[in-house]
Amino acid sequence: MRTELLCDESKYTDILACIFEASTNNVDQICTPSGLIPRIGEEFIRDHCDFSAIIDFPYGISETKIRVHEILLCQSRGIKSIDLVINRYDTENGNLHSIRKDFKICYEVCKTKGLRIRPIIEYRLADNEFLPQLCYSLRENGADEIILGTGSVVDDLLDNIICSRLIEENLDINVISCFPVLSQEHYDMFNDSKIHGIRIKSYKILDNLCNIR
């Protein structure tokens, strides 16, 4: 199972600790809000760790032109992977047209610059009918992987696992689940469910996981 680590620490010492813990554990990628990218040495980004930049974290409510500007800034610092937070109000209101328009523009910018882009959906805000429509639309407009949750909304472990599996099975697209995994038991439940991957919310949790695989 793919394992990613969310790094949204405010202190520079914690950012360094996050990078160190990710490097010494079996973490596939460090995912950090775009605003923190300038605080991370480019040598880490370009030469040592696999980073993704989370654009418009955690609400996704900025105008498209601002989101594009952030993408370009991150690309200039060596970032190769972009995680785009889908507008939470559009998600809650089922505004598929607005989401599709924004994502297509950001996708084309990333494609031109040789970047991978993945949408982040705050799935707890979407109703049961809209969520599969949204995921299908994002897949058809270039997404090859979907991240469920920013980690900023209260979630339920079983709901998350069930939702992730339904999306993967019905829409044939990989899902990364961002859930507050707190123990090896939580981790094993996700791993046993055969979900493509998880995103751990804090580097401090890594000490509780003795078997990342």
Predicted regions span which residues?
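Glycine-rich, proline-tolerant flexible connector loops at the mouths of alpha/beta enzymes
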Residues: S23-R39, S81-K101, I147-L158
